[in-house]
Design a protein with these regions (language model features):
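Active-site cofactor/substrate anionic-group-binding motifs, chiefly glycine-
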Residues: 36-88, 92
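Cytosolic juxtamembrane amphipathic/interface segments immediately preceding
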Residues: 19-38, 179
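Short cytoplasmic-facing helical segments at TM-TM junctions of multi-pass membrane proteins
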Residues: 105-130, 214-217
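Hydrophobic alpha-helical transmembrane segments that constitute the membrane-spanning cores
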Residues: 47-50, 54, 90, 130-159, ...
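Short, membrane-interfacial amphipathic segments enriched in basic
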Residues: 1-27, 206-207, 211
Length: 247
């Protein structure tokens, strides 16, 4: 565990040291960003719409019964901002994008393409890891922001269409707006930046550490996704604790 953590930290620091060279790899970053957004956007839209809808469906009737209909919008808004959108989109990114990164780099490692880069005096960290980490750092916060908006809409539609809740869209969004601040949005975006860095580094690490034949690529992908999700959930608690302490 200590060795694994040190390897992740070492790769993360080396990637950060290579950051001044990001401009030289801008085309690769843009291509990776496009691929990530294209692969995740539709799924994140569907997922967020139903998450917001389920939140309203579960909490709305109970709150309305107790005369707290104004809380429905605030509950959906805060839940999506602070917790559900960042965590769920990060897990989606780990499974959808992180696994692809690990498989790609693992395949290059198995077939000695990484060694060929070293032979040509090309640093794989700069050429392979940096563009992918940078692309995730751009893609995930935007995806989380999009997820928050879609989740709000999902909660609003359920609150409006469900007769047990019976909130108009105007009332729902008015209550939501009253209960949400820019600080709440900033917390969700800040979480997504940390999660993006974790997903990128963990996925690249497992890809670069792949050893053996083609079968080992599958094992690396599985380990990458599992470790990414574990890191996301642990760091989510730590970051939330820091925000609670600051507030």
């Amino acid at each position: 565990m200590i060795r694994y953590t040190s390897e992740i930290v070492s790769l993360g620091l080396e990637t950060l040291r290579a950051w001044p060279e990001i401009w030289h790899h801008r085309r690769k970053v843009i291509q990776c960003f496009y691929d990530m957004a294209n692969a995740s956007l539709l799924m994140s839209c569907v997922l967020s719409l139903f998450i917001g809808g389920v939140l309203a469906l579960q909490s709305g009737p109970v709150l309305v019964e107790r005369g707290l209909s104004f809380v429905v919008g605030q509950l959906v808004g805060l839940s999506m901002c602070k917790e559900l959108a960042p965590v769920m989109m990060a897990i989606l990114m780990a499974g959808r994008i992180g696994s692809a990164i690990t498989a790609e780099l693992g395949s290059m490692k198995v077939y000695q393409e990484i060694d060929a880069l070293w032979t040509m005096k090309i640093n794989p960290i700069h050429y392979l890891v940096l563009p992918r980490v940078a692309a995730i750092l751009c893609a995930l916060p935007l995806l989380v922001l999009f997820s928050i908006l879609v989740g709000w809409m999902g909660g609003g539609l359920v609150s409006w269409l469900n007769q047990e809740i019976g909130l108009s869209l105007q009332a729902y969004f008015s209550h939501l707006k009253a209960g949400i601040s820019l600080q709440d949005l900033a917390q969700g975006i800040t979480k997504s930046i940390f999660f993006a860095m974790l997903i990128g580094i963990v996925s690249c690490h497992h890809g670069l550490q792949t050893k053996g034949g083609p079968r080992s690529i599958g094992r690396s992908v599985t380990q990458s996704v599992v470790q990414s999700i574990v890191c996301i959930l642990i760091s989510d608690y730590a970051i939330t604790r820091i925000f609670v302490w600051i507030e």
